[in-house]
Each structure stands twice: as structure tokens, then as C-alpha cells.
Curated annotation (Swiss-Prot):
The keyword Protein biosynthesis applies. It comes from Salmonella typhimurium (strain LT2 / SGSC1412 / ATCC 700720). One of its GO terms (molecular function) is ATP binding. This is Glycine--tRNA ligase beta subunit. The lineage of its organism: Bacteria, Pseudomonadati, Pseudomonadota, Gammaproteobacteria, Enterobacterales. The keyword Aminoacyl-tRNA synthetase applies. The gene is glyS. It is found in: Cytoplasm.
Length: 689
């Protein structure tokens, strides 16, 4: 069967830059699935994406499906014909569905009887006939939250479509896709190269587009070029470019022919906090800031043009003129804001609603202030500093700078607090209260910042759960999942002595009578334990290990973490599997027991050597392990408990638990309950698989 290279390119208006990669990857994944479902043999499926195009190139695509033999078994002969030998309705219906008459059917004889049988050789359909619908289906499944239509057409897509190129080898596959007739025409760069040209063979892509159209269609190649050229440009001015992955991706999605240029701004603007300048450069203008080797912002920036100019100084000058007013605004806001102390903004917080039922930002500030002070007392942080940080925590939201540059919240609070002469740990806490902002983000760096960050997040969790607005499905408008995980990470990774029970109760208490959910404390804790499950799964822990610990519902996060590590280590022991099975057996036996058990195991009732030996081990371990459990030394405790494998195996081998004599039976059940209680001090290992 012959194979050829296949190409599809959809030429569009400028596609959303933040969605470009996901659109291209989804297009490739969807089309690959279509090929596989159709049974079309193919090689590598390569995707291309530029601002005005999505394309796929498939190597070694078969020109048709393979031929196949089809067999369809019909009714049994007994049901296929009546007493007179005439075909039954069932037989005729089956034959009609196969496109034959009953007398054309074959007979299939087996040990179980005889059936009607249809056999046919089905010729594979051509790729040319299959591909148009496969492309259309793949495009229809793209993750596009909002479609648009253009002109008088009823066609909907993410952006208007101008060209559709469909080639199998050197042949155009005729089709109408997204309202456009397929062709071999490709559009080049808007301002360079050939605006439009034809491609003779799919193998020429993307090289022909590079040479004639001045478009780098390969997304990764374009991104790599921007990164390399920007690093070189920064090196030439003695600096290092801030090439964050997200901005690199966005810029690579904005240009077809990247040309990296270096520009500058007035040094006086460096008096403004670097974060505000960087926010303007990266967020508004998509520029790359440049730092010196000490990490200090330089009065330069790197940007990417989409055209090669004969006079690049004009482009540089134009970008400098664009950014200057934004930097001047930042300078003005910074100077204006510093005429007031942060504390002076407190009254205005009363005018901003946090949530309709939960009050204003000033109300939230009062709760955070109290809760941060309480947490500080629990973890040994400076209570006065934590209380002060709580009072000032939302004041920067009322400043001109944060109002204009919203992503500078927190960090501007830090700068203004330093200007006001606040304690350094208070100032730092104002910035770090929002950490961790995302998975893998840094945690607050000092105890006061930890107290404030936990207080802010717990206040939100308690409040939103307290009015019954917990996250549902993908909807989480108050980012409660992130808040919960943030609290857990801070407590665990900083090893803080906080209990979710008392922490949540305190957060709820501070709301007074505003909350309507009577089960808010349990709901918040259950939600946070659920985030533990997601976190530890991401960390590589097995589901049954997590379930074993969750079964004990430990509410101290640092303690939860210690149990997780202990159970994970226990699983590596040779005795683990047998003891997990034994615990499961014990759990089942005790679940079926209907008689009340004794408080203690009565030694005088023990008869068999195996039960006497097991009881002896339990007494020794009970006394030895109490300090281990009290100190959270769970890994050491489970290592000691692993020594029970032999006496437990011996017990089940030689002892009848459900003895006829009641006192013996109850004593043995009590013995097993004491065994189980020891393991449950750490986790329910009966859940381990």
C-alpha cells in the first residue's frame, strides 16, 4: 500500500495568543485519534502554529484503509425458517441489513448448532474520501470557549478563515471546510515575503513557508529563536533577560517572523519599585525586562518585532515612546501614594464589598487581624507584628498603584510599609500573604508572614463554606482549592504546630452570626483533607496509602504528613503485605462481632500458645510505643509493629477465634481489637492493597 505525506493548513485571522499552543496540540491529538479510529496507517503527526495559521503534517499516510473480511452471524437455523422451510421475519430482516437475500447466506456449523452467516470482502475506503470529514471533526472538537462567525456565513470558528490547504502528496483533496474550498494556496507574512503562493507537495511544508512567505510555522523553533536572540541581546548590554516561560509562549504566539530588539527607558524610573515597572513591561507591553548580575533592574528592555525593518531604530523609538507614559504613570502613582500612610486607607476599605453576606474588606481585615494574632501565638511568631500585619493587609488595595496595576497587590503594600517605617517582618508579610499563588510557588519566608497568609486563606474558606457556597465542579470563583492547599503546604512544609480543627473553629468564631451553615467546621476540614488527597497523589503516593491515613482523619497537617511518610515506608517492609492482609481479616472479624468486648485481655482465659504469645507481644509493644505515638514517630512505630507478623500468622494458623465458649471467644476478639488499635494509632493499614 503506497504512503504519502499529508498536509492540512487552516489560514485565519490572528488567533488568540494564549490559546495558540493548546489549539494546535488539540488539533493534532484530535486528528491522530480520527486516523487511528479509521484504521489509516500513518507515521508522525507534526503540528505547526503561528498567529494566522494552524497546520498538521502527517508522514507516511496510507492512501486508503486496508481491505477487510467481514462476517456477520445471523439467526440460528431453527429460528431462521418455519416448519415449511420459509425464511422467518428475523432471517429476512438480518439478510436485508447485510444487503443480501436469505438464500444467498452461507451456513455456519459449530458444536452448538448451525447459523446463517454473511461473509464479504470489504474494500478499504480511500484516504481522499475520508480526510475532509476527519479534518472538520477535529476542528469542531477544539477547546474554543467562544466561537465567532463572520460575514453572511453561518460558519463558526475561533477566528475568520481565509484559506484551507489540503494536500496528499502533490494532490489537492477537494473539500469545503469552514466554508472555504480547499486549495494549494498558502498566505505568507502580512508585510514580508510573498503574500500568497502555491505549494506543490506536502513535503515542502514548512520550508516553503519559511523561504517564500517569511513565516516560521514551527512554534517551538520560533520560541527557541526568540529565547536565544533575547539572551544574546541581554548579554550585549551586560544583563540577563527575564524570559519567563509564560511570556515566551505568548510572544511566540504573537509573531510569525521574530526580530529581537533592545530599547531603553529613563533611569529616573528605577526609583519606582521594580515590580511595578516589570508589571508594565511584561503585562501590558509584552516586553522582557533586563537585570544586572546582582538582580537589579536595568533601564533597558527587550522586545520582539514581527518584521525586519531597514531602519530598526524607528521601531525601537516607537516602543520607547509607548512604554514611557506607562512608566511615568507608575512613577506618579508611587509618589502620590507615599503621601499617605498605609493605615490611612483603612476607612476606605469599608466601602469595598468582600462578599454580600460576609461584609466589607474592612470587616475581613478585622477578622484577619484577630486570626493572624491567634495563629502567631500558636506557632511562636510575634503576636504584635502579626496583628499589625493583619490590620494593614488589605490597605494597599486602596492605593493608586494597585488600582491601576492590579498584579502589584501585596508587593506595593510591602514597599509602602517600609516607607512608613513598619517592622521588616510586617512589611514582608504584606507581600507574602498571597503565597503560595500557584503550585510550586515559594512559601512565606518568616513566621509573621506565615500567620498572615494562613489567616487570610482560612478567613475566606470559613466564610464561603459558612454561607454554603463551596466549589462545585470546575467552578471555584473564590479559589478555595488553591487557598486550602496553600494553608496545608505552609503548615506541613514549615512544620507548624497547628490543628485544622481549632484553626477552623477560630476562623468561624470570628464571623459571629454571619454564617448560616451549621456544619461549616466539618465541611471545611473535609474539604482540606480532600486537598491532601490531591496533593499527595501529585507527590506520587499511592491512593491506598492516602486512604489508610485519611481513615484516621488526622487534623494536624504536620502530623498527617508524618503518618503518610511512615505508611509509605512501611509498605517497603517485607512484613507489610502479610500484616495488611491480617489487619483486613481482623477488621472483617470485628465488624461481624455482635457481643460487647472486654476492656482488657484476660490472661487467665488465654489457652493456646499462639494467643498467649500474641498477647505478650501486644503488652510489650503497647508500653514501648506510647512515647512513639505521642511524639509522632510513626515510622519507628510501624517498624516495631512489623515484628508482629510471625505471632499474628501463628495466631491465625492455630487459634479458632469464634470458639464455642463465650468467655474464650470474647477474650480472643478483644485480643484482636487490641492488635488493631495499635496499628490504628498510625493508620488503617487494612486498606493497603
Amino acid at each position: 500500500m503506497s504512503e504519502k505525506t499529508f498536509l492540512v493548513e487552516i489560514g485565519t485571522e490572528e488567533l488568540p495568543p494564549k490559546a495558540l499552543r493548546s489549539l494546535a496540540e488539540s488539533f493534532a491529538a484530535n486528528f491522530t485519534a480520527e486516523l487511528d479510529n479509521a484504521g489509516l496507517a500513518h507515521g508522525n503527526v507534526e503540528w505547526f502554529a503561528a498567529p494566522r495559521r494552524l497546520a498538521l503534517k502527517v508522514a507516511n499516510l496510507a492512501e486508503s484503509q486496508p481491505d477487510r473480511e467481514v462476517e456477520k452471524r445471523g439467526p440460528a437455523i431453527a429460528q431462521a425458517f418455519d416448519a415449511e422451510g420459509k425464511p422467518s421475519k428475523a432471517a429476512e430482516g438480518w439478510a436485508r441489513g447485510c444487503g443480501i437475500t436469505v438464500d444467498q447466506a452461507e451456513r455456519l456449523k459449530t458444536d452448538k448448532g448451525e447459523w446463517l452467516l454473511y461473509r464479504a470482502h470489504v474494500k478499504g475506503e480511500s484516504t481522499e474520501a475520508l480526510v475532509p470529514n476527519m479534518v472538520a471533526t477535529s476542528l469542531a472538537k477544539l477547546p474554543i470557549p467562544k466561537l465567532m462567525r463572520w460575514g453572511a456565513s453561518d460558519v463558526h470558528f475561533v477566528r475568520p478563515v481565509h484559506t484551507v490547504t489540503l494536500l496528499l502528496g502533490d494532490k489537492v483533496i477537494p473539500a469545503t471546510i469552514l466554508g472555504i474550498q480547499s486549495d494549494r494556496v498558502i498566505r505568507g507574512h502580512r508585510f514580508m515575503g510573498e503574500p500568497e503562493f502555491t505549494i506543490d507537495n506536502a513535503d515542502q511544508y514548512p520550508q516553503i513557508l519559511l523561504e517564500r512567505g517569511k513565516v516560521i510555522a514551527d512554534y517551538e523553533a520560533r520560541k527557541a529563536k526568540i529565547k536565544a536572540d533575547a539572551e544574546e541581546a541581554a548579554r550585549k548590554i551586560g544583563g540577563n533577560a527575564d524570559l519567563s516561560e509564560s511570556l515566551l509562549e505568548e510572544v511566540a504566539s504573537l509573531v510569525e517572523w521574530p526580530v529581537v530588539l533592545t530599547a531603553k527607558f529613563e533611569e529616573k524610573f528605577l526609583a519606582v519599585p521594580a515590580e511595578a515597572l516589570v508589571y508594565t513591561m511584561k503585562g501590558d507591553q509584552k516586553y522582557f525586562p533586563v537585570y544586572d548580575n546582582a538582580g537589579k533592574l536595568l533601564p533597558n528592555f527587550i522586545f520582539v518585532a514581527n518584521i525586519e525593518s531597514k531602519d530598526p531604530t524607528q521601531i525601537i523609538s516607537g516602543n520607547e515612546k509607548v512604554v514611557r507614559p506607562r512608566l511615568a504613570d507608575a512613577e506618579f502613582f508611587f509618589n502620590t501614594d507615599r503621601k499617605k500612610r498605609l493605615e490611612d486607607h483603612l476607612p476606605r476599605l469599608q466601602t469595598v464589598l468582600f462578599q454580600q453576606q460576609l461584609g466589607t474588606l474592612r470587616d475581613k481585615t478585622d477578622r484577619i487581624q484577630a486570626l493572624a494574632g491567634w495563629i502567631a501565638g500558636q506557632i511562636g511568631a510575634d503576636v504584635n507584628h502579626a496583628t499589625r500585619a493583619g490590620l494593614l493587609s488589605k490597605c494597599d488595595l486602596m492605593t493608586n498603584m494597585v488600582f491601576e496595576f492590579t498584579d502589584t497587590q501585596g508587593v506595593m503594600g510591602m514597599h509602602y510599609a517600609r516607607h512608613d517605617g513598619e517592622a521588616e517582618d510586617v512589611a514582608v508579610a504584606l507581600n507574602e500573604q498571597y503565597q503560595p499563588r500557584f503550585a510550586g510557588d515559594d512559601l512565606p519566608s518568616n513566621p509573621v508572614a506565615c500567620a498572615l497568609a494562613i489567616a487570610d486563606k482560612m478567613d475566606t474558606l470559613a466564610g464561603i463554606f459558612g454561607i454554603g457556597q463551596h466549589p462545585k465542579g470546575d467552578k471555584d470563583p473564590f479559589a478555595l482549592r488553591r487557598a486550602a492547599l496553600g494553608v496545608l503546604r505552609i503548615i506541613v512544609e514549615k512544620n507548624l504546630a497547628l490543628d485544622l480543627q481549632t484553626l477552623t473553629e477560630e476562623a468561624v468564631r470570628l464571623y459571629g452570626d454571619k454564617l448560616t451553615n451549621a456544619n461549616v467546621v466539618d465541611d471545611v476540614i473535609d474539604f482540606m483533607l480532600g486537598r491532601f488527597r490531591a496533593w499527595y497523589q501529585d507527590e506520587g503516593y499511592t491512593v491506598d496509602t492516602i486512604q489508610a491515613v485519611l481513615a484516621r482523619r488526622p487534623t494536624r497537617p504536620a502530623d498527617f504528613d508524618a503518618r503518610m511518610k511512615a505508611v509509605s515506608h512501611f509498605r517497603t517492609l517485607e512484613e507489610a503485605s502479610a500484616l495488611a492482609a491480617a489487619n483486613k481479616r481482623v477488621s472483617n472479624i470485628l465488624a461481624k462481632a455482635t457481643e460487647p468486648l472486654n476492656d482488657i485481655v484476660h490472661a487467665s482465659v488465654l489457652k493456646e500458645a499462639a494467643e498467649i504469645e500474641l498477647a505478650r507481644h501486644l503488652v510489650v509493644l503497647r508500653d514501648k510505643l506510647q512515647p512513639y505515638f505521642a511524639d509522632g514517630r510513626y515510622q519507628e512505630a510501624l517498624i516495631e509493629l512489623a515484628a508482629l507478623r510471625a505471632p499474628v500468622d501463628e495466631f491465625f494458623e492455630n487459634v479458632m477465634v469464634n470458639a464455642e465458649e463465650k468467655d474464650i471467644r470474647i477474650n480472643r476478639l478483644t485480643l484482636l481489637s487490641k492488635l488493631r488499635e495499635l496499628f490504628l494509632q498510625v493508620a488503617d493499614i487494612s486498606l493497603l492493597q
